[in-house]
Amino acid sequence: MSDSDSENKQTTTTATSVTQRLLLSLKEAAKIIGTKGTKIQKVRDDNNVKIGISERKERCSDRILICTGSIEDVSNAIGDICEILLSEDVVTNDEDSNEKENDEYNSIEDEKFVYPFLNFRLAKPTLDEVNDAETLKKIINIRVLVTRAQCSAIIGTKGDRIKSLIENRGVRMIASNQTLPDSDERLLEIQGTSMAITKVLEDINAVISNEVRATREKRYVPHVRRRNQPVSTNTSSNTGSSKSFDEEFKSIVKIPEAYVGAIVGRQGNRIANLRKYSKTKIVIEKRASEVSDDAERIFEIISNDIKNVELAESMLKKNLETEIQRRKEMEETESA
């Protein structure tokens, strides 16, 4: 990136005003507000942003956090919100919530909701995947509300932009295909550390600011659905299953070029068996005409069931680890 590009990006992140909207559960909202509003006020003061949470509606299980300011300030504020949600302290005497105070505030991420849009689709990674217990504790999921136009800009042509954001910032992301009830907004779920989420939000908001014009798309407002209105087209929303017939879940695994052949197997048999067992589609990036063994190829896993995607991802990584260990042992044997 040139000096002028860096200066332009810095100017954009500091000068352009943006508004970020997050979907929250009641418990998340109460935890962010804090005792007598002290926590959300600190976020407001520390980051020089306008931030608030929508009123709690009777018989509604969700609320909206709205944050406005410069791209940098808003992104940092959302990072602070992530830190609040990760904290283990319990909300007490919250004047904005009638919920009974208890330790359930400490297990927000494990809660299952009747309202399907509140249920996270990205499962928390395992210790084997992260390889660091402290980092694992710092990983969190958030639900960002985006319009159709914004979502298209974030995904990019053939998904190139969202892939780049995932790779460059070390996060996982899923954009839902369906809109929230009575609106034109969709959910962009982001998983990562607070710092990684802050950085990717800077990138996302810069894209939206530079490429998406103001539209009249209808924003989502928490409300009680009409009696005959379906909750969701996701047939598994009340069963705890992750399967959705109108959503597509994706994940990317990078495999060093030197190991691609072993992972794919002779005549593609090994990867074919993995596809069949995990019930996923696995798209392998084409090999460049000239590439070194330390280069990486992208294996993109696709399914309408997030559990299948996670299974395939885990199996791919395990196969890679096994092959690396096998070659290491062969080298030690030969050198002995």
UniProtKB/Swiss-Prot annotation:
One of its GO terms (molecular function) is RNA binding. One of its GO terms (cellular component) is nucleus. One of its GO terms (biological process) is regulation of translation. Pfam families: KH_1. It is found in: Cytoplasm; Cytoplasm, P-body; Nucleus; Chromosome, Telomere. Residues 17-81, 139-204, 248-316 form the KH domain. Keywords: Chromatin regulator, Chromosome, Cytoplasm, mRNA transport, Nucleus, Repeat, RNA-binding, Telomere, Translation regulation, Transport. The keyword Aminoacyl-tRNA synthetase does not apply. It comes from the Eukaryota. PROSITE patterns: KH_TYPE_1. Gene3D superfamilies: K Homology domain, type 1. SUPFAM superfamilies: Eukaryotic type KH-domain (KH-domain type I) (SSF54791). Belongs to the HEK2 family. Binds RNA. RNA-binding protein involved in the correct localization of transcripts in the cell. RNA localization is a widespread mechanism for achieving localized protein synthesis. Involved in structural and functional organization of telomeric chromatin and regulates silencing at the HMR locus. This is Heterogeneous nuclear rnp K-like protein 2. It comes from Vanderwaltozyma polyspora (strain ATCC 22028 / DSM 70294 / BCRC 21397 / CBS 2163 / NBRC 10782 / NRRL Y-8283 / UCD 57-17).
